[in-house]
Amino acid sequence: MPVSRIAVGAPGELSHPDTAKAAVAEFISMLIFVFAGSGSGMAFSKLTDGGGTTPSGLIAASLAHALALFVAVAVGANISGGHVNPAVTFGAFVGGNISLVKAVVYWVAQLLGSVVACLLLKIATGGAAVGAFSLSAGVGAWNAVVFEIVMTFGLVYTVYATAVDPKKGDLGVIAPIAIGFIVGANILAGGAFDGASMNPAVSFGPAVVTGVWDNHWVYWLGPFVGAAIAALIYDIIFIGQRPHDQLPTADY
């Protein structure tokens, strides 16, 4: 059972060189992802006079986030595992693939990467508004939580199937592409309703820069619940019993 493999970790992990390298890698990957993803939305709005919320804007956001996440995961895979998402890190922790100590380090790096990316966007665009996540008219907070749970479940299930599963074989090569694709597809499904975050850090950066925190908890609760469910289901049903080990940095 995954619960038996959950590890708090030792304080010494905080000062280990590999942990520091992994944190820097997560910071940079998140910066790349948020700068390209959020920046594409800002550029589309500028070019279309505020058309970022149109169907074409949704398609552009889906494509930009899919491509950016593919790159962000790929460049971080050999160093940190390329989580680029606090929910993915939480799913790895629930499945016994990363210690709590190291997970906290990842979370801090991911959140900082998102904030810095949004600040750089604001500076580079001369003060243009960075789009914060919000619920569309008629969408309640708990409706959005369900959206985030289901979408993040799909994301983390994909992560486990293509990157974490020790039986993945050559399938691991396409992990960054598959992960980017599921995020892009989910944006097409949920973007019009709650922005389709699936990633607390992606929501956190714009909230810090804009000061808009309305329903921000939705973008933490939903992804964390979805990630935990996916990790438990995949680990219990498809991976089964195995000794506790750290998430291999060579794959994800």
Curated annotation (Swiss-Prot):
Motif (NPA 2): 199-201
TM region positions: 24-44, 57-77, 115-137, 144-164, 173-193, 220-240
A single MF term (Gene Ontology): water channel activity
InterPro entries documented for this protein: Aquaporin-like, Aquaporin_transptr, MIP, MIP_CS
Source superkingdom: Eukaryota
GO cellular component, one term: vacuolar membrane
Protein family membership: Belongs to the MIP/aquaporin (TC 1.A.8) family. TIP (TC 1.A.8.10) subfamily.
Name of the molecule in the record: Probable aquaporin TIP1-2
Organism: Oryza sativa subsp. japonica
Gene, per the UniProt record: TIP1-2
